[in-house]
Amino acid sequence: VKKNILLFFLLVLTLASITFAAPLKGTIQVVGSTSVQPLAEELAQAFMAKNPGVKIFVQGGGSGAGITSAINGTADIGNSSRELKPEEATAGIHETVIAKDGIAVIAHPANSVKNLTVEEIQKIYLGEITNWKEVGGPNLSIALVNREAGSGTRGAFEELVMGKNAGKMSNKTLVQASTGAVQQTVAITKEAIGYISLGSLDPKAVKALLVNGVEASDQNITNKTYKLWRPFLMLTKTAPRGVTKAFIDWILSMEGQKIVARDYITVK
């Protein structure tokens, strides 16, 4: 009997020590980069399926809007597809790298040009090279497609390709407000050149050019032979807490990174 009583008390103590996690509940507002947006939406859907008490609302607006929203606390998470500038980093916001993504330089599929050097791309966007025949292509005036000021993809492109000439880009460009709009424009414009998120590339619609003879691919970004890539950041006003922390922690888990790996480069 004493043995049974002892076992009973041990069982009670064991059960008492188990903490049952309450179901997650809450709302998360996510704002920012249109390059990060498709991935953020996919991650949000998977997380909400696991946690029916959580509602996540994802919208674009560009990296500038995401960074500002995080600094001001007007969104729970701000998405950025470029590194923070020094003045942004000093605002005290907390950043989490959730993925890495390449920048693909794209042309119309019918364009015979297959490769451009970084210097040639820079000269094209400076307006110094204006015809495709100057880089071995057809006799067509080059139509420049650019992203809007505040775009993280544009910010990364300016840093990685334009360098100190970032402020001198030609103003004879067709400015588009999202990765999808750039891709769509290049797909229907034979003389166009543009740049987009590699993870959003549709090879049936546009052609990704080699850069310095290297293909834009996850493998070449990982082995550091393709140089045009940037991090995908999730930004919060302070260290993430509550349901926001649970969401970001899950993104960094094996389960979350499996979703990242479908189209992007994992951080683990």
Q: Where in this protein do the model-derived segments appear?
A:
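Positively charged n-region of N-terminal signal peptides that target proteins for export
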Residues: 1-7
